[in-house]
Structures are given as C-alpha cells and as structure tokens.
C-alpha cells in the first residue's frame, strides 16, 4: 500500500495536527470528520493526490448521497477535501487536474423568506439580559440562523449524541434527509448559557422525557413565536420573526459577517 507523508490520508492528518497546534480545534474536528468519511468510502485504502481525478471525486459524492447525506452536507465535506487538494497542488504534490469540476461544493439556499444580516445583527445586539424569556427566544432564533435555518421541530428534537467531531448531524423531520453542519463557537455559546438538562436533548426546549415531549415542543413553539413578535418590534423590524423559524436566513448574507 501507499505509506508516504505525501499520501492523501497522511497529508490531511498533518493538516489536522497543524490546525490543533494553531488553536483551530473546531476546524481540526471537521477535518477529522471528513477524513473518517473519505477513509470509509475508500475502505481504508490510501492514495496519492495525483491519483485523485474527477471520477473518484464523483464516486465519493454519489457514495455520500447513497448514505443519505443531503446536498449541503456532501458539499460541506467536498469543500474540506478540495481545500486540502488545492494545498497539495500549491506544495507541488500534484498538478491541478480540477477533480472537483463536476461535484457540488456550494451551499443551497434553503429559503423562501430571509432576513438581511444587518437586521439579524440588530436582533443579536438587543440587551435582553433582564428579560430571560425574551433572551431565550432570541437565542433559539439565533441558533436557527447559525444552523442555516434549522426548523424549530428539528431543533427541539436534536440529541446530545448528534454532536460529534465538530459536526452536528441530524435527520430533518419533514423530509428524512440527513444533514451535517459545522459546529461553531456561537452555537456552543448558546448551549453553554443554559444549565445542562437531564434529558438526552441538546437544547432546553423539551426539558422532561415523560411522554409529553410533543406537547412541550408545541407549547414552547407557541410561546417563542409570540415573543419573537415583541423582539421584532423592539428591533424596529417590519416583519414577524416567527416565520423565520420555519424558513432559513440567507447563507449568502451570513458570509458577509
């Protein structure tokens, strides 16, 4: 087999170590997650960068889709693999064969209505420290925003075990699609703000596992939607924010931050 420092697996392992050394722990975890996925696809067989061509990369994408990953999730792994490939090209390990030409590396805009980033900033900047229920509603809105517009029902049913290796992986209740999202500091800050609940759920939306989980989710949703209207008023926004827990803000706007 191939066992050189220039092999794809070893090169990415080197990048993981480098990211840890410079303090980019989350980034190193997402690289690790992609490497695990790619190694699994390759059945553990390493390769050199000049063996990577369009056919191989397309097969990897097709394999991920077959495993149930949605387009935004396959694209998330593809972007990491492409970054490593470009770095290998820069280091002279392979000529650029443009193997990513025919695979999807973008972010789908999963939106009907979206909020400009400047307005999200206004919501995030409100001082709600003396209004815990408004603060909580705003945090849930921001969590949805950070996760590219995750719906409230998917947020409510997220499990602690869905968070692994710097990635959040969950199934959409509505479509059954498997989603993978990079876990960020802002998401972690929201979780850290609330004391750990004794349930298997990640967010404190459902707080008791007593058979009434659905009712708890529905009550919380009604309450949060009501409060989001007040938050929109306070931020001087013309539209209700409650619709935005069902539709996602624009990732294109987000990248301007």
Spell out what each predicted region is:
Residues 1-6, 17-21:
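N-terminal helical hairpins
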Residues 13-26, 35-111, 125-129:
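N-terminal core-binding DNA-recognition domain of tyrosine recombinases/integrases
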Residues 86-94, 144-165:
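Short, charged phosphate-coordinating catalytic segments
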Residues 98-152:
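Basic, Lys/Arg- and aromatic-enriched nucleic-acid-binding interface segment
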Residues 128-132, 169-179, 211-220, 238-242:
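Short, contiguous acidic/charged loop-to-helix segments that flank catalytic cores in large enzymes
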Residues 130-132, 225-248:
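Short, basic (Lys/Arg/His-rich) helix/loop patches that form interaction surfaces
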Residues 175-193, 200-230:
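C-terminal catalytic core of Y-nucleophile DNA break-rejoin enzymes
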Residues 246-257:
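Single conserved hydrophobic/aromatic residue that forms the stacking wall/gate
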């Amino acid at each position: 087999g191939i066992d050189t420092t220039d092999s794809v697996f070893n090169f990415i392992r080197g990048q993981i170590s480098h990211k840890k050394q410079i303090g980019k722990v989350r980034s190193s975890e997402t690289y690790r997650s992609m490497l695990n996925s790619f190694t699994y696809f390759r059945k553990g067989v390493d390769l050199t960068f000049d063996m990577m061509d369009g056919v191989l990369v397309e097969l990897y994408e097709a394999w991920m889709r077959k495993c149930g990953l949605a387009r935004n999730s396959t694209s998330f792994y593809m972007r990491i693999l492409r970054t490593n490939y470009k770095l290998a090209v820069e280091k002279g390990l392979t000529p650029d064969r443009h193997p990513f030409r025919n695979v999807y590396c973008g972010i789908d805009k999963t939106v009907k209505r979206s909020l400009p980033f400047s307005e999200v900033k206004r919501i995030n900047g409100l001082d709600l420290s003396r209004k815990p229920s408004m603060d909580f509603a705003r945090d849930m809105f921001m969590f949805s925003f950070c996760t590219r517009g995750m719906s409230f029902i998917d947020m409510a049913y997220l499990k602690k075990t869905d968070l692994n290796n710097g990635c959040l992986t969950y199934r959409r209740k509505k479509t059954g699609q498997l989603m993978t999202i990079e876990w960020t500091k802002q998401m972690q800050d929201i979780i850290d703000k609330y004391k750990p609940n004794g349930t298997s759920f990640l967010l404190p939306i459902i707080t008791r596992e007593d058979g009434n989980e659905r009712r708890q989710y529905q009550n919380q949703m009604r309450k949060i939607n009501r409060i989001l209207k007040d938050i929109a008023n306070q931020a001087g926004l013309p539209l209700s924010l409650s619709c935005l827990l069902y539709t996602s803000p624009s990732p294109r706007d987000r990248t301007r931050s």
